[in-house]
Amino acid sequence: RHNQTGVLFCSAPGRRSGRQTYSRYQTLELEKEFLFNPYLTRKRRIEVSHALGLTERQVKIWFQNRRMKWKKENNKDKLPGARDEEKVEEEGNEEEEKEEEEKEENKD
């Protein structure tokens, strides 16, 4: 069942509903808002929720999910395990430095 704004509404009172379905209009407006600013102030979240017929919580969670999607999309450029390779390289450099220090100490 849908409410007046086109949002799927099928939860019993006091129970969490399943996955939220947003209308095209709501999704477009949320995306536009996200492009303008990926973080909302409480005041702006209230304005957006009233304008779109959503709860503040729905808007807040939509933005959290959208930021995670954006973060994942931007991390695709990096190869999997790139951080691990950097860490191994740093550890290798530390070992080389220790060996050089030991050689210098042994010379004396």
UniProtKB/Swiss-Prot annotation:
Subunit and partners: Interacts with HOMEZ. Forms a DNA-binding heterodimer with transcription factor PBX1.
SMART domains listed in its UniProt record: HOX (SM00389)
GO cellular component, one term: nucleus
Biased composition regions of type Basic and acidic residues, renumbered to the chain: 73-86
One GO term (biological process): skeletal system morphogenesis
Superkingdom, natural source: Eukaryota
PROSITE patterns to which the protein is assigned, alphabetical: HOMEOBOX_1, HOMEOBOX_2
Region (Disordered) residue spans: 73-108
Tissue specificity annotation: Predominantly spinal cord and kidney.
UniProt DNA-binding residue ranges: 15-74
GO MF: DNA binding; DNA-binding transcription factor activity, RNA polymerase II-specific; sequence-specific double-stranded DNA binding
Family label: Belongs to the Antp homeobox family.
Protein name: Homeobox protein Hox-C8
Subcellular location per the Swiss-Prot or TrEMBL entry: Nucleus
Broad class of the protein's primary localization: nucleus
Compositionally biased residues, Acidic residues: 87-108
Keywords: Developmental protein, DNA-binding, Homeobox, Nucleus, Transcription, Transcription regulation
Protein role: Sequence-specific transcription factor which is part of a developmental regulatory system that provides cells with specific positional identities on the anterior-posterior axis.
